[in-house]
């Protein structure tokens, strides 16, 4: 019978380390290399922790883990509701890991998942670049999919959205309405959120194609925004603040494009507070088609 000392010898670590790694003691930190060596040795030797039944004998509840960057955005709430509805229909429970775009929190959840043994993992956003290899390793043993424009270096399955085309369609709509000088407001254009940049690029290129190079003002929020804990009104507030800054510095535009609907709603409020009429004075376009974008505006 294989024992923990056999695993320790094969992995080149102490028996205590084997015990803590395989029992997922989260108050003790081990390097990723050590964890992988121990888990690999245990798998190769067929070692099972005392008291743990064989997976075939152990009837666990079926569960899917979903990594989500925020639960304050209506877009992600709609996404989670859709995932949960389909999962429940098929007898699966859903465990949501709200990372709040915090790399340390994401790493903690990745460690916890090893003990959960879920039937599948869904990333509703790109994994943090530091953990791409860890996610790829996990995908070899657990079905895993990314709902986003995955990093080009990643080999994990993904449902990709053509954000360049999304940006192009937004620009084309404004051009068809006769707009020639416009502004595009967006959350931070960081490496991790490079799909945001794709949407901006598609938008700008369509204007350039129409012979209007230099007619698009890009106004992005500061990168520090993504490092703060998101609040319910984070994207709305960004849209409001960026629009105010455009108005205050005298920028010339007849339309504003928001990276998403919540930013566009913030833009509308900022314009109306400045006594500008929407769409008579300035047009506003968003993206996502969330429920709130169709509500007639009223102050409750």
What role is predicted for each listed range?
Residues 1-60:
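N-terminal helix-turn-helix DNA-binding module of bacterial transcription factors
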Residues 101, 124-169, 189-190, 262, ...:
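Flexible loop/hinge segments that line or gate small-molecule binding clefts
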Residues 1-3, 42-75, 79-81, 90, ...:
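N-terminal helix-turn-helix/winged-helix DNA-binding helices
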Residues 85-129:
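Central regulatory/effector-binding core of bacterial HTH transcription factors
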Residues 87-98, 204-236:
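Short beta-strand elements in bilobed, periplasmic/extracellular small-molecule ligand-binding domains
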Residues 15-20, 56-72, 181-189:
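Short beta-strand segments enriched in small/hydrophobic residues
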Residues 240-300:
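Flexible loop/turn connectors
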Residues 157-185, 201, 205, 236-246, ...:
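Hydrophobic alpha-helical segments within soluble ligand-binding/sensing domains
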């Amino acid at each position: 019978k294989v024992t923990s000392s056999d695993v320790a010898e094969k992995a080149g670590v102490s028996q205590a380390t084997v015990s803590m790694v395989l029992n997922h003691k989260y108050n003790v930190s081990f390097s990723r290399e050590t964890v992988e060596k121990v888990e690999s040795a245990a798998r190769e030797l067929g070692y099972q922790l005392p008291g743990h039944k064989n997976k075939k004998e152990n009837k666990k509840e079926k569960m899917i883990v979903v990594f989500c960057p925020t639960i304050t955005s209506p877009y992600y709430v709609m996404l989670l509701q859709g995932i949960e509805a389909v999962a429940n229909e098929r007898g699966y429970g859903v465990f949501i890991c709200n990372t709040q775009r915090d790399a340390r929190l994401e790493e903690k959840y990745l460690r916890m998942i090893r003990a959960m043994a879920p039937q599948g993992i869904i990333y509703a956003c790109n994994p943090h670049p530091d953990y791409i290899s860890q996610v790829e390793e996990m995908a070899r043993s657990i079905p895993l999919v990314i709902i986003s424009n995955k990093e080009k270096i990643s080999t994990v399955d993904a449902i990709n959205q053509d954000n360049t085309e999304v940006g192009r369609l937004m620009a084309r709509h404004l051009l068809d309405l006769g707009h020639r000088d416009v502004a595009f407001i967006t959350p931070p254009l960081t490496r991790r959120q490079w799909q945001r940049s794709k949407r901006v690029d598609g938008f700008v290129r369509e204007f350039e194609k129409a012979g209007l190079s230099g007619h698009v003002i890009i106004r992005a929020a500061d990168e520090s925004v993504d490092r703060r804990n998101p609040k319910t009104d984070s994207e709305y507030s960004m849209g409001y603040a960026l629009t105010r800054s455009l108005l205050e510095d005298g920028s010339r535009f007849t339309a504003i494009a928001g990276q998403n609907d919540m930013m566009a709603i913030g833009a509308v409020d900022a314009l109306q507070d400045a006594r500008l009429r929407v769409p008579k004075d300035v047009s506003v376009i968003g993206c996502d088609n969330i429920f709130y974008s169709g509500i007639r505006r009223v102050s409750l």
